[in-house]
Amino acid sequence: MYRAVTRRIEVTVEPNYLPERSSAENRQYFWSYTVVITNSGEETVKLRTRHWVITDASGRTQEVRGEGVVGEQPVLAPGERFEYTSGVPLPTASGFMAGRYQMETEAGEKFEIDVPPFSLDSPEGKRTLN
């Protein structure tokens, strides 16, 4: 599991290679990843936007930006957590992802929190992110 904490908001990520959705001969590899966001702070916050940087084993980088996550802009009161699962395809057998979420307090203050860099590994291309 990968973990980052910014302003007492913890983000953990657990990637999972999906061989049933992947094909080495077609150069299509697919992972799911489960993200848990836990608000250990004292303010209620809303997740506004996401920004992902996805890098494959060849060094090609793709950036993904958008509102919310999985169609939601969750609100987390102190002590609450939000969990979701999404997926990512790559044309190589390994890679990594990292990102940021823009959060907003009830007072309207916007700030960014880190999503920890995490490794996307498959049996065909084991690679570890240190």
Curated annotation (Swiss-Prot):
PROSITE patterns associated with the record: APAG
ApaG domain boundaries: 3-127
One GO process term, biological-process aspect: error-free translesion synthesis
Annotated coiled-coil segments of the chain: none
Matches recorded under NCBIfam families: PRK05461.1
Stored PANTHER family: F-BOX ONLY PROTEIN 3 (PTHR14289), POLYMERASE DELTA-INTERACTING PROTEIN 2 (PTHR14289:SF16)
Name used for this protein in its record: Protein ApaG
Species this protein is from: Rhodopseudomonas palustris (strain TIE-1)
Gene that encodes it: apaG
